[in-house]
Design a protein with these regions (language model features):
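Extended intrinsically disordered, low-complexity coil regions enriched in Ser, Thr, Gly, Ala
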Residues: 37-64, 113-123
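Long compositionally biased, domain-poor regions of proteins
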Residues: 3-52, 80-93
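Phenylalanine-focused residue identity feature
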Residues: 3, 43-44, 71, 82, ...
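Negatively charged, low-complexity tracts enriched in Asp/Glu with abundant Ser/Thr
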Residues: 9, 13, 60-71
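Short, hydrophobic/π-rich interface segment
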Residues: 65-87
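Elongated alpha-helical scaffolds
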Residues: 94-98
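Acidic, proline/glycine-rich low-complexity IDRs
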Residues: 1, 101-134
Length: 134
């Protein structure tokens, strides 16, 4: 399988995982993954049809009466997929990214971008990273 085919496969898996985590009809998903060799975080927001209001992923268990443990397991699967995506870059002798913006729509439009910022060296905490992209 070529690098592009592997990317496409992982992109599909990530989009499907997130889609399966949202128990209602949604329109757009905005995802950020921050991963380095020491760990990381992944979070996403989504919109519902007819609304531009962002719905934060951590509200899903409470809002839709879903087990927190089940949701955490799904989130860990999502995190693992982003780690797999980062590892693919290493396997291809490419610089591993530290930030991945992964946005997609219900219609199948996908926008993926990567950054190579040393967040720790620059002193950005979680909210600083989020504000960097606002």
């Amino acid at each position: 399988m070529t690098f592009e085919e592997k990317l496409s496969k992982i992109y599909n898996e990530i989009a499907n995982e997130i889609s399966n985590m949202i128990p209602v009809e949604w329109e757009k998903v905005y995802t950020m993954a921050y991963i380095d060799d020491g760990g990381g975080e992944v979070f996403f927001n989504y919109t519902k049809p007819g609304s531009d209001d962002l719905n934060y992923y951590t509200d899903i268990p409470k809002e839709y009466n879903i087990s927190v443990q089940v949701f955490d397991d799904l989130w860990m699967d999502l995190y693992d997929l982003f780690e797999e995506l980062r590892d693919l870059f290493k396997e291809e002798d490419l610089e591993p990214w530290t930030s991945c913006e992964f946005d997609f729509t219900r219609e199948g439009n996908l926008k993926v971008s990567f950054d190579y910022i040393d967040w720790i060296k620059l002193g950005f905490g979680p909210s600083g990273k989020e504000n960097y992209y606002m």
